[in-house]
Amino acid sequence: MWSRCSISKRLTSFGIAQVINKITSSALDALATVRDGATVLIGGFGTAGIPDELIAALIECRLRELTVVNNNAGNGDTGLAALLKTGAVRKLICSFPRQTDSHIFDALYRANQIELELVPQGNLAERLRAAGAGLGGFFTPTGYGTALALHPDGSP
């Protein structure tokens, strides 16, 4: 019997549920389909729940031009910060890029070596939910009617 954590279901183009086995023999096997330029969602909050083994395997893959979606920009020198340090990440989408120990991201950003898309935490969660549900987008009043809505790049 499959455990609920090891499988997921998806609908085929004919609407038939298909079981997908998510069990792999290693972290590298789990990342076998990730390619240069991929968008990677990395779970966790601060240092809690970070998939360190998968991040280490991602570093070992030596991928480039990644877009990473995470709540923050990494802490210290481990986990997401270690991935950022390799130069593999082109763009970071997050809610909270600046912690007291986010020196790796800070240095990359100040040197214009990484792009940042800052998204309010609730909007980030809703974007992920909407994408997982196959929705094209959603309306949020955040920023509506402000200068930011007219000029998302911050220009006057």
Question: What residues fall within each predicted segment?
Answer:
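Conserved alpha/beta enzyme-core scaffold
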Residues: 15-156
